[in-house]
Design a protein with these regions (language model features):
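Short, hydrophobic beta-strand segments
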Residues: 228-249
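N-terminal "first-domain core" detector
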Residues: 1-43, 177-182, 187-191
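Contiguous beta-strand segments within globular domains
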Residues: 166-200, 206-212
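Hydrophobic alpha-helical transmembrane segments
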Residues: 312-328
């Protein structure tokens, strides 16, 4: 049975637990097309069999759950598409590809408490939940304006872009079991662009907002260790590069962390957001090396330095005698160089 045309599939994360609040920070921080995983018990899902792959959904944040229930607010955050569903004995996992940020339409400024869905995942047709696209900055301002929540006390950020500076290569997103893997290559320059914004509240103006970035410094070089935001908002561009490595491919992670400003809260949740990176050796140098070896072999053979037909005293067709041997030697050189290059 299909959902009606005007029906909306809602995925709701509340602020009752740090784990749920972290989901919203990840949704706010993730770049376009990032795959995020939500894992629920079956009893938290309404009409589970109606929710299928490739359906469009909207991710909501339910705030105010620590205070009076009459002050509950349901805030639409971002659109997404269901890319995969994995059913287990007690749980079901949804893999959502993130799309644009959204806001309630001008006619629906607020969702009444009694109309808030009672299940974490629901299909509803209430016109009061109609949304329209908005900018990331607008969504951040909406979250900062809320009462009884911890958004205002943290630096909000979004990974705007991961792009390659050389060879016009682009980072590729591989949605495998919710793990977002961006592919880059050895000895290459890359650019990381991050949007940042802090609350304009007077109480927050004198605070130092920091975004920590952790990674393997031996693989990803010149990545900023942290970004300190003094202005209300900023866009930071960090150029970094990858070095040489011995194996055909390696894996690493970029871990972004925005700790709360209230330092008196020991071991408070730092809300990690992770991006997996797969590094591959460039085959360009191997191919170039093999090509040069093949050309040198052909030249020396043409000059009579290497002549297998004379050595074995056999009649070999000229096209094979002068072309095939350099080709074979070149291919072997490519393989050996790529396999054992230790730079």
């Amino acid at each position: 049975m299909k959902a009606k045309k005007n029906a909306q599939i809602c995925f709701i994360s509340s602020d009752t637990r740090d784990l749920y609040a972290e989901d919203i920070f990840r949704v706010m921080a993730a770049p376009e097309s990032y795959i995020i995983k939500f894992r629920y018990r079956y009893e938290l899902i309404k009409e589970v069999n109606r929710i299928k792959e490739n359906m469009d959904v909207i991710i909501y944040s339910l705030v105010g759950t620590h205070s009076d229930e009459n002050k509950l607010e349901l805030i639409p955050i971002r659109k997404a598409k269901i890319k995969d569903i994995e059913k287990q004995n007690d749980f079901i996992e949804y893999y959502l590809e993130l799309k644009e940020f959204v806001i309630l339409t001008s006619e629906n400024k607020k969702i009444e408490c009694e109309k808030i869905p009672q299940k974490i995942v629901s299909i509803i047709t209430d016109k009061n939940l109609e949304v329209e696209p908005c900018l990331w900055e607008e969504k951040v301002e909406e979250l900062f304006a809320l009462d009884n929540n911890n958004f205002r006390d943290r630096l909000m950020y979004k990974i705007e872009k991961l792009e390659v500076r050389k060879f016009c290569e682009r980072w590729k997103n591989v949605p495998l079991k919710g793990k977002n893997t961006y592919v880059c290559y050895s000895n290459s320059d890359y650019k990381l662009i991050i949007n940042l914004k802090k609350s304009s509240d007077k109480k927050s103006s004198d605070k130092n907002y920091i975004l920590n970035i952790n990674c393997d410094k031996d693989i990803l070089k010149d990545i900023l260790e942290f970004i300190s935001l003094d202005a209300p908002r900023d866009k930071v561009t960090n150029r970094f590069y990858t070095g040489y490595f011995n194996t055909d491919q390696r894996y690493s992670q970029l871990i972004f962390r925005n700790p709360p400003q209230k330092s008196e809260v020991e071991n408070s949740n730092k809300y990690d957001f992770k991006i997996n990176i797969k590094l591959k050796k460039r085959k360009f140098y191997s191919i170039l090396f093999g090509l040069l070896i093949g050309i040198l072999t052909a030249v020396t053979k043409y000059n009579g330095i290497i002549t297998f037909s004379k050595v074995w005293n056999k009649s070999i067709p000229e096209i094979i005698d002068y072309s095939f041997l350099p080709l074979i030697i070149g291919l072997i050189s490519v393989f050996l160089f790529h396999k054992y290059d230790k730079k």
